[in-house]
Amino acid sequence: MAAGGSGVGGKRSSKSDADSGFLGLRPTSVDPALRRRRRGPRNKKRGWRRLAQEPLGLEVDQFLEDVRLQERTSGGLLSEAPNEKLFFVDTGSKEKGLTKKRTKVQKKSLLLKKPLRVDLILENTSKVPAPKDVLAHQVPNAKKLRRKEQLWEKLAKQGELPREVRRAQARLLNPSATRAKPGPQDTVERPFYDLWASDNPLDRPLVGQDEFFLEQTKKKGVKRPARLHTKPSQAPAVEVAPAGASYNPSFEDHQTLLSAAHEVELQRQKEAEKLERQLALPATEQAATQESTFQELCEGLLEESDGEGEPGQGEGPEAGDAEVCPTPARLATTEKKTEQQRRREKAVHRLRVQQAALRAARLRHQELFRLRGIKAQVALRLAELARRQRRRQARREAEADKPRRLGRLKYQAPDIDVQLSSELTDSLRTLKPEGNILRDRFKSFQRRNMIEPRERAKFKRKYKVKLVEKRAFREIQL
């Protein structure tokens, strides 16, 4: 085993010495120059990478990079450039006549002519010309355009020119008169007019034309609905505060406002007491017991169950007899009618139709004598409809100033801003402020049916609260 291990180790060390490039000290070591170079497949990507890292590949890359640099900087290879491009004849300095100092104006003009640095950065520094030859199949309709050019060349030899050329020549021969731009003295002063009035002077040229044509050609604006011209509420936007809300009110005005605020507070207190009375728990004597609850649940069930069986018992035998024994009328219908019976039925039917027609004619004749009564009934009906219409109109006018219910909540009037008699001061510096402008504007919008009343969103927990007892606490607890 030891010998085998030492042999393997010797092979591995000799291989590493050979790969390192140094001459080994072992007798089995080989000169790196005489070592055979390892070759591999060159048609695979692995071979391409190895070839690029070898000296020949690096030399080729450097040569190609040098060629590209010469093409970018000088426009071609320096070895192929002529002598005039590489050398010049020195005939002396050209700055002899420029010994004079430049003035500030000259310096400024030179600075203005000098291009900006940002423009120089964006300029193309490469001298390699852009490719101009485009293949024919890359141009859309190339064959068609080529045939067109050949056709126009043929027509040009015959003296016929394209339409665009003929139009250009006609414009040159007959130039149009240039219109002078109107100056401020040439403009006609137009009087002011109401933009929203019905007699708009801009609409006068469209008067008398077809409305459908004007709408389709977009020369006539869309007609605004009449409801957009009416306000949602006739209430004023800004309400004047009552006289009692002044910082220095009279005694009567202040007492009147205090009584109004007192009535509002009493009404609110009554509603709260009513709600509390309805939701209050009943007394011990009136509390519901288990027996009373069961009796209420069974209320009306026992009487209905006793009376339900009697009708069914009486109907059972009769229904069975009806199914067993057919009625005589049913037997008569099954028999075939004779010709005499059919003639009698037709005569009876014809007689009934004649009697009905005579009766209808008699009634129509009698209606002629009831014209006065019918007119009176129509007049009463029209008067009733007019009265209902007036009542609806009056109700609508009365509710015009009242807020409508636009959403889920009703409109609640704001509290009356009033100060007590003890809070009134004789100085504006010590006056206590009342109300809020932002809240007042929002309440005004709600009262004028412009926005719906809202309330603050209630907090609702999305998950259930879970109580967990910690293990450390559970172990310590006795």
UniProtKB/Swiss-Prot annotation:
GO MF, any single term: p53 binding
Region annotation (Mediates interaction with CDKN2A/isoform tumor suppressor ARF) ranges: 148-431
Subcellular location, record wording: Nucleus, Nucleolus; Nucleus, Nucleoplasm
Residues bearing the modification N-acetylalanine: 2
Transport among keywords: no
Keyword Phosphoprotein: yes
Effect recorded for residue 289 to A: Decreased degradation in response to DNA damage. Decreased phosphorylation, degradation and increased interaction with RPL11 in response to DNA damage
Comp. bias intervals (Gly residues): 1-10
InterPro entries, sorted: Nop53/GLTSCR2
Main location: nucleus
Region called Mediates interaction with human herpesvirus 8 protein ORF16, residue ranges: 342-386
Alphabetic keyword roster: Acetylation, Host-virus interaction, Nucleus, Phosphoprotein, Ribosome biogenesis
An annotated GO BP: negative regulation of signal transduction by p53 class mediator
GO cellular component: cytosol; fibrillar center; intracellular membrane-bounded organelle; nucleolus; nucleoplasm
Name of a matching Pfam family: Nop53
Chain positions covered by the region annotation Disordered: 1-51, 303-344
Biased composition (Basic and acidic residues): 333-342
Residues bearing the modification Phosphoserine: 29, 93, 305
Role description: Nucleolar protein which is involved in the integration of the 5S RNP into the ribosomal large subunit during ribosome biogenesis. In ribosome biogenesis, may also play a role in rRNA transcription. Also functions as a nucleolar sensor that regulates the activation of p53/TP53 in response to ribosome biogenesis perturbation, DNA damage and other stress conditions. DNA damage or perturbation of ribosome biogenesis disrupt the interaction between NOP53 and RPL11 allowing RPL11 transport to the nucleoplasm where it can inhibit MDM2 and allow p53/TP53 activation.
Quaternary structure and interacting proteins, as annotated: Homooligomer. Interacts with PTEN; regulates PTEN phosphorylation and increases its stability. Interacts with RPL11; retains RPL11 into the nucleolus. Interacts with CDKN2A/isoform tumor suppressor ARF; the interaction is direct and promotes ARF nucleoplasmic relocalization and ubiquitin-mediated proteasomal degradation. Interacts with NPM1; the interaction is direct and competitive with MYC. Interacts with NF2 (via FERM domain); the interaction is direct. (Microbial infection) Interacts with herpes simplex virus 1 early proteins ICP22 and ICP0.
Descriptive protein name: Ribosome biogenesis protein NOP53
